[in-house]
Amino acid sequence: LVPLFVFILFLHKCFFTTSNNNKKLPPSPRKLPIIGNLHQLGLHPHRSLHKLSKKYGPVMLLHLGSKPVIVASSVEAVRDIMKTNDLVWSNRPKSKMADRLIYGSKDVSFSPHGEYWRQIRSITVLHLLSNKRVQSYRAAREEETSNMIEKLKQMSNSSSSATDLRDLFCWLAYNIINRVALGKKYNDEIDAKATLDKFVELLGTFNVGDYIPCLEWVNKITGFDSKVDKVAKDLDTFLEFVIEAHMIRNEKEENRAGESKDLVDVLLEIQNGKETGFPIQRDSLKALLLDPFSAGTDTIYTVLEWTMTELLRHPRAMEKLQNEVQGLAQEKAEITEDDLPNMHYLKAVIKETLRLHPPIPLLLP
């Protein structure tokens, strides 16, 4: 009887302890014990949420495991949350996965709202993503794009079979971000790409402990925790290798005239107090270096892949875009970023692709 009584208390604590207040809550679909409404999200949560909003309205309450979640599906509701009451909703739930992989969630995306977040956001906007800084990486973007096109030509000439563009786009995104963030392409050092790919994959993996805390032990049994620990360790080893290489190079004061600074250089200057009055710690520096990889790799190649897919599905659109490119390239060896302001149809194609296939259809909670 004692084990049964303890088990009943355990269930009550985990699943049935609720607030007894009489606050009016948004409409909500019926939830199941333990998992709440998780089963209703399916493989495409944004589509499932859209269907649920048709039934329960533009503002509804879901329970993802033990976590209550408000879902806003109309312009008015989103404006009220993100603009009118921005400070009320400015924080986000703690993510155990981000804590373990991103040094206690010290990056811009996952750090809690507060003075630290305001400082690193300011650093990111003013020093890492300013127009001047983005333009300084133009040569890297154009060179890697040319390399990809040349490789595509070689693959087309040497084989009669179909070419997998996804792999090419993936390497394009990875190489550009490597050069922008870390200063060069790291393809062989301690298997950098495999480690970074695992990092991005794990960051988007469902972690049962975040939603059903009393089932967190499942991760230990399945070996998931060990996998996360190994990736975190490999990631830290790689970032330490990159940072130490930059510090040694800077100490030697090697001639870098005309060479643009990468993100590691900028963050090291900030850490030394040369750029701002907010010196950042080593873990914060490494966390900020991971943001371009977590936010910029799969989003880039996914959009490129879907753009090509839609153009192949719509030959007339493909022909119209080809005519635009050929018109600009008549007297030029190649198209550059200077031509983008005149490529109106290309911009329309990209916007339509983003509308049909948004790489991140849901905002971070």
Swiss-Prot record:
Entry keyword Magnesium: no
EC numbers: 1.14.-.-
Family from the record: Belongs to the cytochrome P450 family.
InterPro entries: Cyt_P450 (IPR001128), Cyt_P450_E_grp-I (IPR002401), Cyt_P450_sf (IPR036396)
Enzyme class: oxidoreductase
Protein name stated in the entry: Cytochrome P450 71A3
Organism annotation: Solanum melongena (Eggplant)
Signal peptide positions on this chain: none
GO molecular function: heme binding; iron ion binding; monooxygenase activity; oxidoreductase activity, acting on paired donors, with incorporation or reduction of molecular oxygen
Keywords: Heme, Iron, Metal-binding, Monooxygenase, Oxidoreductase
